[in-house]
């Protein structure tokens, strides 16, 4: 019995103490996964991966669905081809060459298996398995699937090890055949998950499986496959709620079919919004069926959807330093990367009323767009709740004030290119400068996005990527195996703020000797800054080049520091202070009206009122209604309610 009241985080931590923590994931698992239920050939698949690279679309993991093995060529006397362990020579004549090709392209590979039918006589591994188990191979007796039989378990994993020798990195265990075994009460899915995960750690390899949820305690065996999804808005809308509430039982590393798997309908806006949710999901695995009309390649979609897809896939990879630090947090502290809003605010009723909104790590709050865009405003609407304090739009630095202790509810509107992502005042988010670089190594070039208005800190964790060094016990290894780069932000009410990056501590051998840093202060006004390294003002001998820039669109003041010794302490000062950027209300309202699908005369009247009255213009916007009185009357006016809503967000946000 767990009686914790509303102390949700404490309850989940204690549950994991009893049932086991969520293990640390390998770095590549946090990047983009390409998956499709499709009969690829070796040439076709490698060509596809090559095009992704040419188009600048980054992936770290390739998922080969069940058609890697014999399916339709199985003699009916053996049953169906649903279970299989023999590569299809028509599609993959040289499996090792194929898997080597994926590795050369920087991809780790998993393949799909349905183990229920055991190992049958048509399979290449059959003779060896039959000898191990002791069945009559001459009579072609099947090696029955039986996890309670130690001989079968030996034959089963010997077969998998032989296949892994060609280059398979981990297995997608797609069990769908119920929970019955020879031993009453023993769930085969549970045993499969346990055995495969433990086996995947042999020889010092980083353990990983990809399988279905087998009940409480399954957090010990990441990653979770949530099953086939239907391509509908309703299905998309369910996923944020599903993911965040799974954290209530400590299960954090979910992989959904991003973009939807089957049935449903084509809706390009839906696909873009699903991609955007995927970028802020625990695992971002694109997936689709074998239908020739449902491929998820971004070039299959029209602009601006195509660009939105590519941008958000790059964003996911760029977030790797942040994601990997949250990976360590999940393994050591027991906090899943996605959590419902009420975990941090259990006594505030409003935090329970936003099922589509969630925290993404320590620094971000995400409210994905899960309903179709309004055609008048050309924007998707999301109802969000922000706890007390100042918040900033992660992408453009606009400030949102929530002064009341109970927080603030508001409707926010976003174009097809992004979703609402907020960072609280003082937030610090480290990112990888080049989302197309090797995701398995610690990056040389980093961007750090810093938000004003309050003090903040962030401890970025990096490791060698070698499981032998990092070790299975993340809590024990965190000091010896990781390098920790501490970042602190002292706001000082903007009078004399300073941002500091300390020299890394711990296992500093895993950090590049020199780094390029881009420090981005978002949501601020222009200001002078001074950079100090190792206690001295920066000079040419310490760094290659220093560049300062200001982007008015995102209200971002940035400094680029090239070729900085990793052992240096970096300090950024603002001798003249640093102010919050003024809210560009008129410019943002003009953009909304420019995009709006409505009468030009109404746009002009609305903009005139906003320019003259500011926030006081809101009541008057609903009076801009005039019907055409006769055929010669060219003046008419109509103000869509959705456009008023989008304008209200801008006028009232701070």
Where are the model-predicted features located?
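A short local loop/turn or secondary-structure capping micro-motif enriched for an aromatic residue
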Residues: 375-376, 401-403, 408-412, 431, ...
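Catalytic-domain carbohydrate-binding cleft regions of carbohydrate-active enzymes
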Residues: 1-418, 423-424, 466, 647, ...
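Short strand-edge motifs at loop-to-beta-strand transitions and within beta-strands
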Residues: 555-557
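Acidic/polar residues at beta-strand termini and the immediately following turn/coil
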Residues: 146, 393, 463, 492, ...
């Amino acid at each position: 019995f767990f009686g914790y009241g509303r102390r949700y985080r404490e309850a989940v931590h204690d549950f994991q103490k009893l049932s086991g923590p969520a293990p640390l994931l390998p770095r590549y698992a946090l990047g983009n996964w390409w998956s499709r239920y499709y009969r690829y050939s070796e040439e076709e698949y490698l060509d596809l991966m090559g095009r992704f690279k040419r188009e600048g679309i980054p992936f770290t993991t390739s998922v080969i669905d069940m058609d890697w093995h014999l399916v339709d060529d199985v003699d009916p006397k053996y049953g169906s081809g649903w279970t299989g362990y023999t590569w299809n020579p028509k599609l993959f004549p040289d499996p090792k060459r194929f898997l080597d090709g994926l590795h050369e392209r920087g991809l780790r590979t998993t393949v799909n298996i349905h183990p229920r039918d055991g190992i049958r006589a048509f399979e290449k591994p059959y003779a060896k398995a039959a000898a191990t188990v002791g069945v009559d191979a001459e009579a072609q007796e099947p090696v029955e699937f039986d996890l309670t039989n130690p001989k079968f378990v030996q034959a089963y994993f010997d077969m998998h090890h032989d296949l892994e020798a060609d280059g398979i990195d981990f297995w997608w265990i797609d069990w769908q055949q119920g929970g019955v075994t020879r031993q009453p009460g023993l769930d085969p899915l549970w045993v499969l998950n346990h055995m495969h995960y433990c086996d995947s750690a042999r020889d010092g390899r980083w353990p990983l499986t990809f399988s279905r949820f087998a009940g409480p305690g399954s957090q010990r065996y990441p990653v979770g496959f949530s099953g086939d999804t239907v391509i509908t808005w309703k299905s998309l809308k369910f996923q944020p709620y599903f993911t965040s509430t799974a954290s209530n039982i400590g299960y954090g590393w979910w992989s959904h079919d991003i973009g939807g798997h089957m049935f449903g309908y084509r809706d390009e806006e839906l696909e873009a919004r699903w991609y955007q949710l995927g970028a802020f999901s625990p695992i971002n695995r694109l997936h689709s069926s074998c239908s020739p009309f449902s491929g998820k390649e971004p070039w299959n979609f029209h602009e601006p959807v195509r660009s939105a897809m590519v941008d958000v896939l790059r964003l996911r990879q760029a977030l790797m330093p942040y994601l990997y630090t949250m990976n360590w947090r999940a393994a050591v502290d027991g906090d899943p990367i996605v959590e419902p809003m009420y975990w941090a605010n259990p006594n505030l009723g409003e935090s329970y009323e936003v099922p589509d909104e969630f925290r993404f790590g320590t620094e971000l709050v995400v409210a994905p767009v899960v309903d179709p865009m309004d055609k008048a405003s050309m924007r998707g609407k999301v109802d969000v709740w922000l706890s007390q304090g100042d918040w900033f739009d992660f992408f453009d630095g606009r400030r949102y004030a929530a002064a009341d202790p109970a927080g603030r509810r508001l409707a926010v509107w976003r174009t097809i290119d992004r979703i609402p992502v907020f960072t609280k005042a003082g937030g610090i988010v480290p990112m990888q400068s080049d989302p197309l670089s090797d995701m398995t190594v610690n990056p040389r070039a980093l961007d750090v996005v810093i938000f004003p208005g309050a003090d903040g800190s962030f401890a970025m964790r990096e490791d060698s990527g070698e499981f032998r060094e990092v070790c299975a016990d993340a809590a024990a290894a965190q000091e010896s195996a990781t390098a920790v780069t501490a970042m602190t932000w002292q706001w000082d009410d903007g009078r004399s703020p300073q941002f500091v990056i300390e020299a890394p501590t711990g296992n500093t051998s895993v950090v590049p000797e020199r780094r390029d840093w881009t420090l981005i202060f978002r949501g601020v006004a222009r200001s002078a800054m001074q950079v100090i390294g190792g206690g001295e003002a920066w000079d040419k001998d310490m760094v290659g080049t220093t560049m300062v820039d200001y982007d008015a669109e995102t209200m971002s003041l940035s400094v680029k520091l090239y070729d900085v010794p990793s052992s240096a302490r970096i300090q950024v000062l603002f001798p003249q202070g640093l102010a919050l950027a003024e809210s560009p209300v008129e410019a943002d309202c003009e953009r909304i009206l420019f995009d709006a699908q409505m009468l030009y005369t109404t746009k002009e009247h609305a903009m005139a009122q906003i320019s003259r009255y500011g926030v006081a213009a809101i009541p008057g916007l609903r009076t801009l209604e005039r019907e055409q009185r006769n055929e010669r009357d060219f003046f008419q006016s109509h103000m869509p309610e959705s456009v008023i809503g989008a304008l209200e967000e801008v006028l009232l946000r701070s």
